[in-house]
Curated annotation (Swiss-Prot):
The record marks D525 as: Involved in J base recognition, conferring specificity towards J-DNA. Fe cation binds at H189, D191, H239. GO terms for biological process: base J metabolic process. InterPro entries: 2OGFeDO_JBP1/TET_oxygenase_dom, DB_JBP1, DB_JBP1_sf. Residues 392-561 are annotated as: DNA-binding JBP1 domain. The DNA-binding JBP1 domain (DB-JBP1) is necessary and sufficient for binding to J-DNA. This is Thymine dioxygenase JBP1. The lineage of its organism: Eukaryota, Discoba, Euglenozoa, Kinetoplastea, Metakinetoplastina. Binds 1 Fe(2+) ion per subunit. It comes from the Eukaryota. Its cofactor is Fe(2+). It catalyses: thymine + 2-oxoglutarate + O2 = 5-hydroxymethyluracil + succinate + CO2.
Length: 813
């Protein structure tokens, strides 16, 4: 319940950022400075979106990352996320990789605090110290991740395990520290301070979102991660996150990730000196028995905190079967095609896919003026200070979602019982008096819709009393004696929305009778001018109110004592309390699978060895769409639809020289090309209505699905084609959606959507003679795939916006 309470408190004050001290110009300057050092990379930056489990290596065979899908048990991630969600708080320490804004991030476990104003170093984080009793909730997920790491990269795991001081292990693993990120899209960075000779691990432990892939920036590959996915990776390569894929700004999403690593400064001589000092001090207290009785120094290796060297791999669609674990049976054959396709001067991509892997003068990328801010989710919003809170739509809508937190059910976990009782009584009294006055108003005018507030009424005095209680509730939720302006804004907005809703729902008043503006004006009276009523009261009433205010404050402080003591104790904690939070996890009692057995099962298909060379012939079948219409001659002209008028998006699409070359070229399927023999690669061509019956290593569907408008028939065709390949299927199609779609301003998205289908349909008519091509979005294409979609490859600059989905011929077991 402690973690749940902290999560509630954090969410109450997690309102849109309102920074009165920063002008829009200052925010823009901060953003520009941050992205200059740490740029954001959109999905379109990379040529590969990797969806399945796989091993990603660089050009010299070094592992960049190993990703495993659904590799963590649900109970383990659920337990960990319930605790760790409250560790991610607004922090300016990582603002440079969030466009100059403060992201939701935090650390747990042990930390060195080198370079920090915290006086005492090399110890438990405040989060672990404050949650010591609940800390065991993270042990299962830490154990599972450690065992997966050990099975995937045993030598790296061993080196890290041998180096980490035993005092700072999390549950006996080679991890000392966890970094927890919530709704945090990181800009390009490397992780500084991790163990050079080991790897870090990242797991998504909760969320409901699309996009936000982990990108290896120098290798141009996006790794999609969803809840329960794990990746063991070299965090010294530059990495970042792609954009979140939401259709509108109001669409809700959440994402919680945890990074597991060894913070090497904890193994340096200065940290060992701190451990020994604490141990010697503890020995002076005969009543204290440390969990660890000695400090054994270990070799920590050389840690330079430099980016890993980059040995790039020239990408192609045939590189992807070499990565995917489920396609290892055809990896050597794919390697033969990949090496031939990426050789200097090779035209194999044009032969197999009908166009090159990259086109330099294709559809242009967007400028920053057309895009949303990469960290726009937390951007500064305009402040309309009309009283006690901001009346901007975003603040009010956010408060409407959070008003439930002022219900007794939630407050009972967050403030003292005495203060809660005062809140309930003051709230009930004010509502009683409002109801009494409203009933009287309706007697005078049954058609009345607006509540008339009387400043000298008993109801007004009850409102001020409720505000006094509310103020102490706010401070009790914050666990401090004074609130920041932005915290006051958040609370009073929620307070007003809560009371307005109570009048409507409990007193059955019209929705706007007790309006937010009315409450805002009265809150302004309370917060900034309420004392003018106080001075007119009789002395005995003034004394009664002063005593009442003191009792409310004492009720609030009574509930805060324990929390404040715990936090203050951490700042001054100089004890040798290493590993006091550790305990045994009884996997058998809970009927949980043992970490070693679980890791063995989820890593059984992991391949990290070099691929053998394929000597036999590699058979590739390329399927072309049947010709529907023959375009007479070449040099086709685009017909501008009547609905377009003067669309800048239409002008942008048709401005590409590559588009004009495509229109001037002959149709690609006027007749079947002859078979091609390229080294040991044999390529055969057929029309989509005459599929053969013999087997091939690979089958390529070249814009075939655009000829099949019915989704059921299109999906069935994929199944038929997949049955012809022993390796994998390549589904090549136009993605009608702009590759930067989710980064665009909403007005530009609408303008693009209005012209893109017609534009690509005309290009298909010119290229393949398709009368009315069914061009689909990425999501629509992937919904057709009945088996496993391992990855998506994007032909760069393609005038047809061509993407290639790599599909396993069989469904997962």
């Amino acid at each position: 319940m402690e973690s749940s309470t902290k999560r509630i408190k954090m969410d109450i004050f997690n309102f849109p950022t309102i920074k009165e001290t920063r002008t829009p110009e200052e925010v823009a300057e901060s953003y520009a400075e941050a992205v200059k050092l740490h740029p954001f990379y959109d999905n379109a930056h990379c040529v590969i979106d990797f969806y399945d489990s796989g091993t990603i290596k660089d050009g010299r065979g070094e592992i960049i990352g190993v990703v495993l899908r659904k590799a963590l048990p649900k109970y383990a991630t659920s337990m960990a996320s319930a605790l760790l969600i409250s560790a991610a708080v607004r922090t300016s320490l990582r603002s440079m990789i969030f466009g100059g804004e403060s992201p939701l991030s935090g650390i747990a476990g042990y930390f060195d605090y080198r370079g920090s104003p915290v006086e005492l170093k090399s110890r438990k984080t405040s989060f672990t110290y404050e949650h010591e009793e609940a800390w065991s909730a993270v042990f299962p997920v830490v154990d599972y991740v450690s065992e997966i790491y050990r099975h995937v990269a045993p030598e790296r795991w061993k080196a890290q395990n041998n180096a980490i001081p035993d005092l700072v292990r999390i549950h006996g693993t080679p991890f000392s520290t966890l970094t927890i990120n919530s709704r945090f899209r990181t800009a390009s960075h490397t992780d500084v301070g991790d163990f050079d000779a080991g790897y870090s691990c990242i797991a998504c432990i909760d969320g409901k979102f699309k996009g936000l892939a982990l990108t290896f920036d120098d290798f141009r590959i996006n790794v999609l991660m969803q809840p329960r996915d794990v990746m063991v990776f070299d965090s010294h390569h530059f990495h970042s996150n792609t954009e979140v894929e939401v259709s509108c700004s109001e669409e809700d999403w959440k994402r919680l990730t945890c990074v597991f690593y060894y913070r090497t400064a904890l193994g340096e001589p200065s940290s060992y000196a701190e451990y020994r000092r604490r141990l010697e001090k503890s020995k002076q207290d005969p009543s204290f028995t440390p969990v660890v009785s000695n400090v054994m120094m270990k070799e920590n290796g050389t840690n330079l905190n430099r980016p890993s060297p980059v040995h790039p791999v020239p990408p192609s669609p045939f590189w992807l079967p070499m990565l995917a674990h489920c396609l290892q049976h055809c990896a050597s054959a794919a390697q033969s095609v990949h090496e031939a396709m990426t050789a200097d001067g090779s035209q194999l991509a044009e032969i197999i896919f009908g166009e090159p892997l990259s086109t330099s003068d294709g559809i242009p990328l967007r400028g920053d003026d057309e895009k949303l801010k990469a960290n726009g989710d937390t951007g500064a919003k305009p402040l309309s200070r009309l009283g006690g809170f901001s009346e901007t739509d975003l603040m009010v809508s956010t408060a409407a979602e959070k008003r439930k937190y002022l219900d007794s059910e939630f407050l009972s976990h967050c403030i003292s019982a005495q203060l809660l009782d005062m809140w309930k009584q003051a709230r009930a009294r004010w509502l009683e008096l409002v109801g009494k006055e409203w009933k009287h108003m309706l007697t005078l005018n049954p058609e009345r819709k607006d509540f008339l507030w009387k400043n000298r009424s008993e109801m007004n005095s009850a409102f001020f009393d409720l505000c006094e209680v509310g103020k102490q509730v706010m401070l009790g939720l914050l666990d401090k004696e004074a609130a920041l302006p932005k915290e006051e804004q958040a609370f009073w907005t929620m307070y007003a929305v809560h009371l307005s809703a109570a009048c409507a729902e409990e007193l059955h008043m019209p929705h706007d009778a007790m309006s937010l503006r009315k409450l805002n004006v009265k809150l302004k009276d309370f917060n900034f001018g309420g004392t003018r009523y106080f001075k007119d009261m009789p002395p005995e009433e003034q004394q009664r109110r002063m005593e009442r205010k003191q009792r409310i404050e004492e009720a609030r402080r009574h509930g805060m004592t324990g929390a404040h003591e715990k936090r203050a104790n951490w700042l001054t904690n100089d004890s040798f309390d290493y590993q006091t939070e550790d305990c045994v996890v009884d996997y058998a009692k809970h009927k949980w699978v043992l970490p070693e057995r679980h890791a063995k099962a989820v890593t059984k298909n992991v391949h990290t060895a070099w691929l053998p060379t394929r000597e036999e012939v590699v058979r590739v079948l390329v399927v072309l769409p049947d010709l529907q219409i023959r375009v007479e001659g070449v040099d086709c002209k685009l017909e501008k639809p009547d609905t377009v008028e003067d669309s800048s998006e239409w002008v942008r699409l048709v401005s590409s020289p590559a588009v004009h070359r495509l229109l001037a070229a002959a149709q690609r399927n006027l007749q079947l090309p002859d078979d091609v023999m390229h080294g040991n690669i044999h390529i055969r061509f057929v029309f989509h209505s005459t599929l053969p019956t013999d087997m091939y290593d690979f089958v390529v569907l070249q814009h075939v699905l655009s000829r099949i408008p019915d989704d059921v028939l299109a999906s069935s065709y994929i199944t038929r084609a997949a049955a012809l390949c022993s390796g994998c299927l390549f589904v090549e199609e136009t993605d009608v959606q702009c590759r930067q779609y989710y980064t665009l301003k909403y007005s530009i998205r609408r303008n693009y959507d209005a012209v893109a289908p017609h534009f690509f349909q005309q290009l298909h008519q010119a290229s393949y003679g398709t009368k009315m091509a069914r061009v689909r979005t990425k999501g629509e294409l992937e919904a057709l795939i009945p088996t496993v979609c391992c990855a998506r490859y994007k032909l760069q600059g393609s005038p047809l916006n061509t993407t290639i989905h790599v599909v396993s011929p069989t469904a997962p077991h």
